Regions:
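Non-ligating segments of multi-cofactor redox enzymes
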Residues: 1-226
Length: 226
């Protein structure tokens, strides 16, 4: 198993992606199906830390029609799909419908907890990471458990992530989606459109992995439909 994990990791890293842990589904869990129709026995999560995939994505995008919808999702599906085919797995995406419980899988695989923004807080990457897909296998692939990594939010007294948004989109009450969307699209939303979420950028952890402004602008445009 270790050899295969190393081979999968090597196949992913050429496109800036990494394995984000995994686990074996309990026998009584309603696991998703693999291509053959059988229930998957294990899942390996695929994602990114920081902006590592961005140059690879941009090179791919230059070769695609300008009208392609959801280009980052399309690129992720292609890259992870190729790896899945090479290793006899089924590739799935967070945007697949019906939606799969990716956040729950991530908690199980890496032992992370949500930040006040809902994004899982990573002890190294902070809020600057993402899950791009997963590989489902018909065999049991046992990985070491994640343990209990420190939850950095517990030690953060100031909580700047709840104090930086001009419309208080994030609070202890949750995410005010409509208020955020209206602000980003409006006349005062240029800082958010060009540099990303102010609350997310206010987080003091994992700053060396923070996405550059052009990447944050790309994600904000996708969120706001701009």
């Amino acid at each position: 198993v270790r050899g295969m994990i190393e081979e999968i990791s090597a196949a992913l890293v050429v496109n800036g992606l990494i394995l984000r842990g995994g686990f074996v589904f309990p026998v009584d869990e309603d696991a998703p199906h693999i291509a053959s129709g059988a229930l998957a026995k294990s899942v390996l999560l695929v994602g990114q830390a920081g902006a590592a995939p961005w140059p690879h994505f941009l090179r791919w995008r230059e070769q695609q029609p300008s009208t392609i919808a959801n280009p980052l999702d399309s690129w992720s599906r292609q890259v992870i799909g190729d790896v899945a085919e090479a290793f006899g797995a089924r590739a799935v995406s967070p945007s697949d419908k019906p939606y799969l419980p990716f956040q729950q899988w991530a908690v199980r695989a890496e032992g992370l907890k949500p930040s006040p923004l809902g994004i899982l807080m990573h002890p190294q990457y902070g809020l600057w990471h993402a899950y791009r897909g997963a590989l489902l296998f018909e065999d049991e692939i046992a990985l070491p458990g994640p343990g209990e990594p420190a939850h950095l939010c517990d030690a953060c007294v100031e909580k700047p992530c709840l104090k930086s948004c001009p419309v208080d989109a994030y609070s202890t009450k949750g995410f005010a989606y409509q208020a955020c969307l209206a602000h980003v699209r409006g006349g005062n939303g240029e800082p958010c459109r060009s540099g990303g979420c102010l609350d997310r950028n206010a987080c003091p952890y994992g700053t060396e992995y923070r996405y550059p402004p052009d990447i944050q602008a790309f994600h904000m445009a996708a969120f706001a439909g701009l």
